[in-house]
């Protein structure tokens, strides 16, 4: 069975092309940089929620802010993994400041097999990043999204 996610990739030309990405939170990602970043995104159930609505909801939940106003462009559907599909929207985020975030949280057993539950931020920081750095930082399944964004803006 395939799981579906939707995400919103903000971009700006500052003067070079940059994207807003977020470092995943929690103990697994704490000491990682390469492959440990993501666009704001999350799961949705096709037929029960529209991908764009899910992308907006996840942006709000993960970053604690509303996405800026503007024209959303669907970049496409990407195979994030063999069992997960990701619908991505692009939005010009010129003027959107990467500050004032209120990161959403999740709970998990920590330390493992301890029987104790701890809360961690879904993401622990977000920032504007040039495309070369973003290609290294993004999780592997999201890297093709950057190529699609470049094609859109060419």
Task: Label each region the model flagged.
Residues 77-115, 127, 149:
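Active-site-adjacent beta-strand/loop module that shapes the phosphate/pyrophosphate-binding cleft
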Residues 38, 83, 119-122:
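Short glycine-enriched loop/turn motifs at secondary-structure junctions
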Residues 14-17, 26-29, 45-46, 82-83, ...:
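Short, charged/polar surface micro-motifs in flexible loops or helix N-caps
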Residues 127, 131-154:
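Charged phosphate-binding loop/patch that engages nucleotide di/tri-phosphates or the phosphate backbone
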Residues 35-40, 46, 91, 151:
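Functional cleft and adjacent loop/helix regions within the main domain
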Residues 116-132:
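Alpha-helix-centered segments that form part of catalytic cores
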Residues 39-75, 130:
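The catalytic Nudix box helix
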Residues 1-39, 67, 89:
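N-terminal strand-loop-strand
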């Amino acid at each position: 069975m395939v799981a579906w996610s939707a995400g919103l990739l903000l971009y700006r030309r500052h003067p070079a092309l940059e994207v807003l990405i977020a470092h995943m939170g929690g103990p697994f990602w704490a000491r990682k940089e390469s492959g440990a970043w993501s666009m704001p995104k999350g799961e949705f159930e096709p037929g029960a929620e529209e991908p764009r609505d899910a992308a907006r909801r996840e942006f709000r939940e993960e970053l604690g802010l509303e996405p800026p106003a503007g024209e959303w462009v669907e970049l496409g559907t990407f195979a994030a993994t063999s069992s997960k599909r990701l619908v991505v929207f692009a939005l010009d985020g010129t003027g959107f400041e990467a500050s004032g975030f209120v990161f959403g949280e999740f709970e998990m057993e920590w330390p493992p097999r301890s029987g104790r539950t701890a809360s961690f931020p879904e993401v622990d920081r977000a920032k504007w990043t040039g495309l070369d750095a973003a290609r290294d930082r993004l999780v592997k399944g999201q890297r093709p999204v950057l190529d699609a964004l470049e094609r859109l803006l060419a």
